[in-house]
Amino acid sequence: MTTIFDAFKLEGRVAVVTGGAGLLGREFSRTLAEAGAAVVVADIQAGAAEAVAADLTAQGYLALGVRLDVTDPALVQAMVETTLARFGRLDILVNSAALDPKFDPEALARGIVPGRFEDFPLDLWNQALAVNLTGVFLVTQACVQPMLAQGKGSIINICSTYGLNGPDQRIYVRADGQRVGYKPVYYTVTKAGVLGFTKYLAAYYAGTQIRVNA
């Protein structure tokens, strides 16, 4: 039976997925592996990254788990070097790492309401900019180097509809009538930034074999 993977075969390609052990990152990693790519599962949680990679390997796929803090240029460069040392190339980058208030234990522990702007802490704002925006810049800057050397590559930035429109807090109401804060200010701001970054790079690499999408 013909499957979608027959149209999108990735044998011989190497993909890096940042946030690869996260809710979305795990699925991106699995799908790329099923399509035939060797997958580098890069995540700030080293154990989780290794577990995802081990699961893929147990299924017969090529995968490697690597610890990556996208805000640390040295760790970003080390991840690229590890990828090249293990697989010899780097063809695909999926920028999936991001802070999301639903899964941010620090924010939850501090009792921060995701949608409340008036008292949103500056330190969490700065942290989100560092991870969600600067991290995408740093990882892309490092990964595009081997792509340029190879003459082709694909960069995929995970964005959101909230990068185009802010969440209307009025529609997020529980059955008991209590309004629930949904997505903090940084989420829309950083996702809009990622979209702008994608447009810039798509135009910048126009005419080359480097493709940039969101």
What is the predicted function of each stretch?
Residues 10-40, 201:
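Canonical Rossmann dinucleotide-binding motif of NAD(H)/NADP(H)-dependent dehydrogenases/reductases
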Residues 77, 100-126, 149, 166-180:
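Conserved mid-core segment of classical short-chain dehydrogenase/reductases
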Residues 99, 111-137, 152, 156, ...:
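Catalytic Tyr-X3-Lys loop
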Residues 140-141, 199:
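A short, exposed helix-loop element centered on a Lys and neighboring polar residues
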Residues 145, 203-207:
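Alpha-helical segment proximal to the catalytic Tyr-Lys
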